[in-house]
């Protein structure tokens, strides 16, 4: 379980330490990191919005796997479970994933860091639009099972993938709540350049933070790119 993962993380860092002081410092750093994670993890199950966020990230992971991208690189680049601002970071390339209803497509940004390209060579935004369906679709559970199957050839990667799911708050005991079905309608890809409509930290007055806002698709049409461009750059 997630607490075993926490202890394992501490033991691994201690094993890599050369001196007692180094071991103590690393242990304190690990505890601090995990405290922040525990504060954010929803142990009571994922909300609908959290489920949709995870579905979007899983759709992108499957897209990359289906395009023969390195499974190891994909897992290492998946920063969403660490509650970082970007969902994926491949070297200097950041990727933010969004999922919304196909009936009223819009991009919801939850904080000023998500579209901030500081310290990145390039930032992309991918938007998936879905429709609620009764049958012939996929659920969060079925998408996770599909993804696990693709990682099943490597036991270590499969284990790491399951650990990342736990960090996001996905636990087996809540599976019955994750059978809502969706159908993928369309996906959009954008290059988040300097002129892309967004709010970033440097634009905000002192004391203002955690800004949440929506972007209309019509406002970002000129920033559209082909998904192949993203594939080539990561």
Spell out what each predicted region is.
Residues 1-83, 101-234:
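Nucleic-acid endonuclease domains
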């Amino acid at each position: 379980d997630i607490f075993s993962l926490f202890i394992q993380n501490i033991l691994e860092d201690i094993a890599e330490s050369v001196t007692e002081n180094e071991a103590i410092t690393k242990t304190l750093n690990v505890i601090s990191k995990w405290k922040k994670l525990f504060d954010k993890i929803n142990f009571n199950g994922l909300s609908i919005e959290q489920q949709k966020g995870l579905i979007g990230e899983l759709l992108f992971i499957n897209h990359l796997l289906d395009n023969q991208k390195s499974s190891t690189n994909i897992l290492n680049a998946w920063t969403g479970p660490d509650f970082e601002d970007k969902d994926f970071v491949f070297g200097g390339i950041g990727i933010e994933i969004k999922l919304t209803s196909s009936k009223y497509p819009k991009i919801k940004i939850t904080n000023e860091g998500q579209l901030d390209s500081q310290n990145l060579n390039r930032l992309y935004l991918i938007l998936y639009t879905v429709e609620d369906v009764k049958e012939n679709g996929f659920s969060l559970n079925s998408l996770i099972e599909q993804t696990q199957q693709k990682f099943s050839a490597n036991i270590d990667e499969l284990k790491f993938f399951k650990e990342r799911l736990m960090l996001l708050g996905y636990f087996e005991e809540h599976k019955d709540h994750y059978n809502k079905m969706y159908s993928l309608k369309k996906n959009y890809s954008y290059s988040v350049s300097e002129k892309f409509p967004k709010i970033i930290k440097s634009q905000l007055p002192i004391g203002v933070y955690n800004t949440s806002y929506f972007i209309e698709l019509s406002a970002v049409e000129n920033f559209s790119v082909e998904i192949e461009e993203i594939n080539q750059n990561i």
